[in-house]
Amino acid sequence: MNTLQLIFLLFFFPTLLFLYCLPYKRNQNHRRLPPSPPSFPIIGHLHHLGPLIHQSFHALSTRYGSLIHLRLGSVPCVVVSTPDLAKDFLKTNELAFSSRKHSLAIDHITYGVAFAFAPYGTYWKFIKKLFTVELLGTQNLSHFLPIRTHEIRELLRTLMVKSRAKERVNLTEELLKLTNNVISQMMMSIRCSGTNSEADEAKNLVREVTKIFGQFNVSDFIWFCKNIDLQGFKKRYEGTHRRYDALLERIIMGREENRRRGKIKDGEGKDFLDMLLDVLEDGKAEIKITRDHIKALILDFLTAGTDTTAIAIEWALVELINNPNALEKARQEIDQVIGDERLVQESDTPNLPYIQAIIKEALRLHPPIPMLIRKSTENVIVQGYDIPAGTLLFVNIWSIGRNPQCWETPLEFKPHRFLDGGDLKSSLDIKGHNFQLLPFGTGRRGCPGVNLAMRELSVVIANLIQCFDWDVVGERLLNTDERAGLTAPRAVDFVCVPLERGNTLKILGSN
């Protein structure tokens, strides 16, 4: 901060304080806002928040109610912590809350045209259709099945080598490598090699982008700090953007050269980059896109499909290790349905209801993205309260998953609650129709990759259960603390010694 900026803050602070509070108090007198904790001028309720914001919101909700109004600096917000309220906001008033929160970092890194943050409209609808029908349609998911199968086999072989050498493995990193390779090959036909390949560089950049998106930037919340880079945040996200742009430009130029030389075949099985280049080169396309759109859309998918899936797999394994009875039931189901002569395949997973229940229970307790964030585009009234346009909505799905009014013994890992005879029926899905379980969101803004994610989760978890035990080096229970950020991974990496089960070599050799 330079001297002039410091003088500005010191000598004009009282004036800013007065000007800031006056209109806010006047507006409040004419609105019926939800309950709110005590606040301070300028910072509002920011002092109530710790590093794990979803947990801070949960604590506030237990004290002030399931619908609360907050002012984060100069940004009005509401926090929702029950399924009924989530339904009121996300379904009954879906169009009013169809926009997403933006930030200085998000707008810069994503070229201002990211699908994930685009307003609901023609462009958003076109890209959503491209995602769901073309890239993630049943035909294309089947086309990419060999890629998913190969990457899972590579993971299992890596773990088998570590097992025989009795060496520790960082399973957190191995799962990230797996999910990144699957997504990178679907996007751009590249994979991590461990030798500074383009895919390795992309993986590292995606992790950096995810960290940036999840970090608090005072310039996004205190209006008079907007042009003051107090945290050095701007320099960081601009540098990340430059590196990502240079990487994608190299990849796109290489692909364009291959297309000119006729090395890319027409027809089925194109990756997403080819699909986007087809749109770019099509003069009659419904929507005109640029190279910046292509780069932003690829980043959308890389960030959405890499960390989240790996985090979900890791949490499921951690809970199974901490709950050995559930782990044993899962193995019994695999033995009965599949046997011990071959690996579980994607086509088997619908016949493994306990594995599906494990996934639902892990996503209930540990949603990889703990909150759904929307922004209102118009004034609305919800349950008698005024919600002004421009209000940020936080639906705390982490809190909903721990709500004792929704779940019996909510802090316990009990997969059987999702089976017939449990607390809930197995028909309770995770695709956004049941508002007590929303790990993939709901409605128009629901995750378009839910089918791919569930295929990966099911087969990877089943294969890891089938082939290995885990020596966590003397720990009785694995740590379940979370790390702060846009996502909610474990606070510490999952490092263990994989223990090969009796028939692992035979099973791997037969596949």
Curated annotation (Swiss-Prot):
Cofactor names: heme
EC number: 1.14.19.76
Gene Ontology biological-process annotations: flavone biosynthetic process
Keyword flag Transit peptide: no
Molecular function GO labels: heme binding; iron ion binding; monooxygenase activity; oxidoreductase activity, acting on paired donors, with oxidation of a pair of donors resulting in the reduction of molecular oxygen to two molecules of water
InterPro entries: Cyt_P450 (IPR001128), Cyt_P450_CS (IPR017972), Cyt_P450_E_grp-I (IPR002401), Cyt_P450_sf (IPR036396)
Protein's membrane topology: Single-pass membrane protein
Keywords: Flavonoid biosynthesis, Heme, Iron, Membrane, Metal-binding, Monooxygenase, Oxidoreductase, Transmembrane, Transmembrane helix
Pathway where this protein functions: Secondary metabolite biosynthesis; flavonoid biosynthesis
Pfam families: p450
Family recorded in the similarity comment: Belongs to the cytochrome P450 family.
Purpose: Functions as a flavone synthase II (FNSII) that catalyzes the direct conversion of flavanones to flavones. In vitro, can convert liquiritigenin, naringenin and eriodictyol to 7,4'-dihydroxyflavone, apigenin and luteolin, respectively.
Identification of the protein by name: Cytochrome P450 93B2
Highest classification ranks of the organism: Eukaryota, Viridiplantae, Streptophyta, Embryophyta, Tracheophyta
